[in-house]
Regions:
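A structured binding-face within diverse protein domains that lines the active/interaction site
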Residues: 1-175
Length: 175
């Protein structure tokens, strides 16, 4: 499960969701793709993302993200919010499953040498605006947030190449 902040019926909720977006309209959840990334450039067009983009945006808390053996974090090591989409699938028996994915964009100059995409990072202070469902004008106002975060307040550290043999060794990768 992934921790996500969402707004529903005017109230913000923190909840655990399954990673990989399962659209609410899917008939058979076992046969449906469950993307973990949604490209910012196509979220308004693709059927899987169109509804969540309009009504179900979420925030995913993070202290860093990984790309090709590197950890990218804020220089001050503070938490930040990744832009996400969520949806609720309701089964024939009434059971509910909430799922989410992260929105990606082109990379900034720090991430570009590592990968051609990076997560969308919501600018500090704009979290509530991101969560607010809205009409076309509101969504168009969100589009500037879908661009790469500036490289300056970020830091990129190479991780040790060896994979951990057990859970206790994982922390040593960051030494």
């Amino acid at each position: 499960p992934v921790l996500a902040m969402r707004r529903e019926h005017g109230e913000d909720h923190l909840s655990h969701m399954l990673w990989g977006l399962l659209p609410g309209w899917v008939k058979d959840p076992l046969q449906a793709p469950r993307p973990i990334n949604a490209r910012a450039e196509t979220i308004a067009e693709k059927a899987s993302f169109r509804g969540p983009w309009r009504h179900h945006r979420c925030l995913l808390p993070s202290t860093g993200f990984f790309e090709k053996g590197h950890l990218i974090q804020r220089k001050d090591r503070q938490m930040f919010w990744l832009a996400g989409l969520w949806d609720r699938w309701i089964g024939p028996d009434g059971s509910e499953v909430e799922t989410c994915c992260v929105i990606t964009t082109r990379p900034n100059s720090l991430v570009a040498p590592l990968h051609d995409r990076m997560p969308v990072i919501i600018p500090e202070g704009l979290e509530s605006i991101w969560l607010e469902p809205g009409d076309g004008a509101h969504r168009r106002a969100l589009e500037p947030m879908l661009t790469p975060a500036p490289a300056e307040p970020w830091d990129c550290r190479a991780l040790k190449p060896a994979a951990p043999a057990n859970r206790h060794q994982q922390l040593s990768l960051l030494d």
